[in-house]
Amino acid sequence: MTLRPLTLAVMAVLCAAPLDDVVARSAEAAPASSTPAEITIEPARFAPPPISAMPEEPASRLRPLITRYRADREALEHVRSLVDDGREPLYAPSRAQLRAGLVANWQARLAELDTNTLNQDDRLDRLLLQRELALDATAQTFGKERYEALRGLLPGYDDLVALLEARRDLRQADPRRTADVLERVRRDLEARASRLTAASGAPEVSPTLALRAAQHASALRRGLEDWHTYQSGYDPQFSWWVDAPYAALDKQLEAHGKLLRDTLGGAADPETLRADPIGDAAIAEALAAEGVDYSPAELMAAAEKELAWCQAEMDKAAREMGARDWREALERVKQHHVAPGEQPRLVVELADEAVHFLEARDLLTVPDGAKRDWRMTMLTPEYQLQAPFFLGGQDVWVAFPTDGMPHERKLNALRGNNRHFSRAVVHHELIPGHHLQHWYAQRHSTHRSSFDSPFWTEGWALYWELRLYDMGFAATPEDRVGMLFWRSHRAARILFSLGVQSGRMTPDEAVALLVDRVGHEPENAKAEVRRSIAGDYGPLYQVAYLVGGWQFRALHEERVTRGGWSEREFHDRVMREGSMPIRFLRERLFERVGGEAPGESWRFLDNPANASAR
């Protein structure tokens, strides 16, 4: 039996009832809370500790080099960016040459260092900077390969990019010659569109490639708009020669992008989910760069075992609730949501509850200033189409229905953000999760901020979901179901992310996986997949949650369970070391950072702490 028929049946019942009745029933069903007193805001919370109590930051010979490289790179990107909206996929030859030169020069500078004269922190920073340079070089190669694959769909691509790059070189456009270029590209695009739409002569164009080319066409339009505004009206000759050809080209580019996106890409409906898989080779390279010595097949097998473990645990909780199985238990839990307008109050309650739990067990240091130096923002209805739950970092963003949402969307949002689901993830977004990471990153090892890894960022927050579950943070069977729902979700993310990025699973199949095997609302599942493939996150970002959590669990077992460190010592040390791939962090915690990247394989899934994945 799948969850989809059950979900649709329940939704039909709920949608037939007034929303007030649904809220009233859920409020009656929700277990009472026994949260400790709310944390208060006092001026002393933001006072620094005495100098003698501040942990000493290790001096690093590499810190000035890292700072200089970061400044050089940011300057290059600032000057050579062709589209100033943060979403530019364009391949620009001159910029690529400058990037390659920057990487090569810095690699040469690092080679001048004698690793025998470096201490552990210096060696670590050197390896992290080396890794970042190598990743930059790999990204440049990958970008060029993708450009070569699509340039045939966008005739004149190189000519238009040359105009944009000339502006970055501070060269004024020659009006007459520029007009000729724009008109020639317009005619070539028109001819290419005719061939693409001709029934007899249409070449084989994959939807994936067509959609990628459509993104480039859109980026060219945005770049050219800024380029045109820069000179039009300020240079009479430019306006006289260029304005009309530019307007005609812009119209042609818009039509060409629509052809690529809607007709060849099959994405005329904005609700259509389309992915752009990176392929097996790129997946393997990305995992290797993170120090993950497992193949995609091995990770997917571990995710299947974790998912089965979660469902068995859910069945136990379901029996305690008097439910037939985990699906019925999950359906009951989804009814335990607060009334409209009450979610912000619940978030504060749950945030404080997590802090009290951590401090009562001396698990890590939660600085007073970190407990309330975050804001809360409600996600807009539009943003909830991609992020139907919580988001976090420096602050927390909360998903909950608004009065203007359609009735069914209101119910989806209420059910998906119920008390028990929320209790399982508020600490993920705030403390000890992302907000605490941000607090420490602003004050310790700040030069390592550019070495961020999603396996560290999301793995740390996910690790705490696993640890808190083991320590009994879920006080009721309903709370356990809430935590197990999200743990199942993380396992499913490995399955669908690796499946979609390899091209072996479609986005629609990913949605079905989340609905049928995890228990998501259909609309929430679609939003989760849309967010994963929209391009705002790296292709392995969703994989990083549970895999990073497994890595941290294994590292905890090595250093605390077997190594004799205290809980606080381990967790505080992780936070103070700063962001990096966990494989590198492991070397630092064992005081064995060498001159080269770690060579010994780390089979963290074999660690007894990860028995649920074996």
Feature map (PLM): residue ranges:
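Gram-negative bacterial Sec-dependent N-terminal signal peptides
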Residues: 4-17
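N-terminal maturation segment of proteins
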Residues: 25-614
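Sec/Tat signal peptide C-region and signal peptidase I cleavage site
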Residues: 20-23
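N-terminal acidic, proline/glycine-rich, low-complexity intrinsically disordered segments
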Residues: 2-3, 25
